[in-house]
Amino acid sequence: LSDVKPMHCKKVLLSMDADYAGSTIRQTYITMGTMFKAAKMNDLIAKHPMDSVRFTKPVRAPDDIHFLTRDEQIRFLEVAKRSHNYNQYALILETGLRTGEMIGLTWDAIDFEKRTLTVNKTLEYRHKQHFWRAGPPKTQQSYRTIPLTDRAYEILKEIKDKRPWQKESPLLSQTLEYIDRRTGAISRLVMRDLVFINWRTGEPAKNSSYDTHLYKLCDEAEIEKFCMHALRHTYATRAIECGVQPKVLQKLLGHASIKTTMDRYVHVTSESLDQAVRQFESGRVS
């Protein structure tokens, strides 16, 4: 403990920026502060390394957020149809799921009769530790049930019908435990129940492999490279363009604040600007 310096504490918090919600980072900040305060009170350390560390909620700059124009989306999907990850990409564009929510999607979360998809867990591969980690959705509000579009329903039904011929690896015999954010109880993710399994390996595809594959597809489609989260941004943008109310979109995306929905995920496109001018023209008073 005596070797820990303020710079080490800051590094821990900064490393969480990309993968964790601001509330989770803040809770880590508080826990670290409490731990070192107790260590100092018990004479285990002479100086409190968190004294000079201040918590600042991470804010993503609008310029860092990428989304596809309608033309880019069409070109991308045409190329992606020939790839083994097409269903994953298409489903995010139809539902706005986060990558971890899509990877952790299990069949018990899909109701074909009611045509809904419930988000109640996530799954990601930790490369440094070399293991799969199940967890709760990003925030309390991220728990949600999403009505399926016709296309989303078709994608999931097609995967379900093909599943009996799916290759399976020993990894699928595992059951991962995690804490339910709403109740504090232990929940379980049965790996064999995952919707998306790589047909060649019989395992779920790792988070980073999706981005690597996306870059290749972007080159083929001759569009600017983007990462998986851009598909979620694109879903939000298309929804607003189609007239979905921001408050409704907030619920579909699982945001705690309407401000997050508007500031971070909704973009003004040239198409929507043209449409706004046409609407203004049609309502002009002569």
Task: Give the residues covered by each predicted segment.
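N-terminal core-binding DNA-recognition domain of tyrosine site-specific recombinases/integrases
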Residues: 1-44, 202-210, 224-230
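Proline-centered turn/helix-capping motifs that create local helix->coil transitions or kinks
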Residues: 40-49, 112-115, 121-128, 161-187
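Catalytic-site neighborhood detector that most strongly recognizes the C-terminal catalytic loop/helix
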Residues: 59, 67, 123, 234, ...
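Short, basic (Lys/Arg/His-rich) helix/loop patches that form interaction surfaces
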Residues: 19-22, 78-83, 95, 146, ...
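C-terminal secondary-structure termini that scaffold catalytic or DNA-interacting sites
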Residues: 114, 125-143, 147-152, 158, ...
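Generic recognition of well-ordered alpha-helical segments
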Residues: 11, 30, 34, 150, ...
